[in-house]
Amino acid sequence: MKDIIIASFYKFIPLNDFESLREPILTKMHEIGIKGTIILAHEGVNGGFAGNREQMYIFYDYLRSDSRFADLHFKETYDNKNPFDKAKVKLRKEIVTMGVQKVDPSYNAGTYLSPEEWHQFIQDPNVILLDTRNDYEYELGTFKNAINPDIENFREFPDYVQRNLIDKKDKKIAMFCTGGIRCEKTTAYMKELGFQHVYQLHDGILNYLESIPEGESLWEGKCFVFDDRVAVDQKLDRVYPQLPQDYKYEREQK
């Protein structure tokens, strides 16, 4: 049995006091023994952390004790080893950095599709299936027939849209990422530009892999994750792909 719970979460919500939240959260992580990284910004919170079951449930309750976080949803995976080496709480301009001002996923994100709905939807040949992740993530694994935007970081995605999709505002566009947060921003951004039919995989690739049997899955390869596991297979088990020595990535994205 895998004893370590690895949780990822995010919420877009205005946090005018986000700077003052850093020290209390970090202190609680140290007190409980939780390891991982939490990002705070004016637009909300994003993070991934791990511990044993008792530690995690205590920390869940602590975070939810703030009324603004009472409905936080923690997406869990499991391992025999904690994939984080320390506790960190960072202050940023954005909880996932796209670099576009006035994009508000809290009210204008794309339509959510459950894994089962997504599985059927992306088999429609009229749907544009777009991987919003970085090129190194795409190379490890992606959905069958997904388009690679060929970007090195998330900040390049808006430029990709402007160069390649701006004339497709009437098309059905389905977007996905690891845990859902990047799709919240990309779909909101595209709706602001006037795209009419924008969809996203609810809770991301990890939710799909957990929900759809491997024999039926349209996922091909491994799924990159933003911790020391590096990637997981279709059973959400840790794998160790051979990566370039200069391999770099941004752990805060999901």
From Swiss-Prot:
What sequence ranges are listed for the domain Rhodanese?
A: 123-217
Write out the GO MF terms: oxidoreductase activity, acting on paired donors, with incorporation or reduction of molecular oxygen
Query: What is the native source organism of this protein?
Result: Legionella pneumophila (strain Lens)
Family note:
Belongs to the TrhO family.
Q: Which GO terms describe its biological process?
A: tRNA modification
Identify the gene encoding this protein.
Answer: trhO
What is the stated purpose of this protein?
Answer: Catalyzes oxygen-dependent 5-hydroxyuridine (ho5U) modification at position 34 in tRNAs.
**EC category:** oxidoreductase
Q: What is this protein called?
A: tRNA uridine(34) hydroxylase
Q: Catalytic residues per the record?
A: C177
| Entry's EC annotation | 1.14.-.-
> In this record, what's one Pfam family?
Rhodanese
Keywords, ordered alphabetically: Oxidoreductase, tRNA processing
Q: Give the reaction(s) catalysed.
A: uridine(34) in tRNA + AH2 + O2 = 5-hydroxyuridine(34) in tRNA + A + H2O
Query: What does the record list as coiled-coil region(s)?
Result: none
Which InterPro entries does the record match to this protein?
Rhodanese-like_dom, Rhodanese-like_dom_sf, TrhO, TRHO_N
Please give the NCBIfam families that the UniProt record associates with this protein.
Answer: PRK00142.1-3, PRK00142.1-4
